[in-house]
Amino acid sequence: MANTTFNGAVRSENGFKTVSKNATTGVYTDKAVMNSSGNLYTTAGGHLQYAAATGYGPSDLVIGKGGSQYGTANPWAESSTQLFPLGTKLIYGNNVYRYGLLGGTAVTAGKLVQHQAQDSDHLNMTATAAVSAGETDISVETGGTDLTLNEYADGYLWVNDVNGEGQTMRVKSNPAHDHSSDPSVVITTYDALVTALTTSSQLSLIHNPYSGMVIAPATETGAVMGATVIDMTADYYGWFTVSGPQALLTVGTLVLGNIAVRSGGTDGGVAPATDNVLTEIGEVMAVNANTEYSLIWMNIQ
């Protein structure tokens, strides 16, 4: 029944299986089983992949270490090549990870990372023409700084003021852009505008938050996106903890069961919560000394 197409419902009293056949031995191996109770079992985790079609962006979920046929989902490994869409979520045991790209500076294990700082030339840009509701191509005039091809792909374009303000769209693509030649550039989004724009509308851009991440500086320049699991090489791809137990650099004296926050004094570290309004990272599970690594139940997503 290989490659058989059915028109209508398919029923089975005892469930379904997907199998693979060894070309040499002819032995069949179960890859996934849905039993008669509707429970789904896979031999090595699973990968729910939303195939990117016109108008839709990738939204991948991997369940289980190694649970993907497209690449090994291993939080304790890094690679120079991209294996998954940036932002892919991995659930493994009690932990949740996000797949990302580190920026141009290496970061050791157990450090908080944030998204790359926004380019001020791509903030408060004006629309160069009115854009009707239902459109996905939006022309803006930048304040400077050239754009490389698809630099903002899977980042965000939002209307920050005047007509259409409050709308946030995921970026699908942008062309290479030389500001000295033409200050305007067309940004294409996955989803269409709901409220029309005018030439008075102001818009801003930010990169994919999981692209080009940096150690979270003591003086904040963005939001915390996760924590390094291993010593990571500059410009390499890997997994970053966002939820569950993670050893993090300790700054000061943490208290069991209390909240740990982003450190305002040491890059990449966590500190006890004080009156300062800093990002809550999670709850303290086990305390180690200042400059050592305490176990934190992270909960940033």
Task: Enumerate the predicted regions with their spans.
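A short, compositionally biased
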Residues: 35-36, 149-153
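Extracellular receptor-binding modules and their adjoining Ser/Thr/Gly/Asp/Asn-rich linkers
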Residues: 52-149, 161-301
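Short conserved beta-strand and strand-loop elements enriched in small hydrophobics
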Residues: 154-161
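Intrinsic low-complexity, repeat-rich intrinsically disordered segments enriched
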Residues: 1-62, 271-275
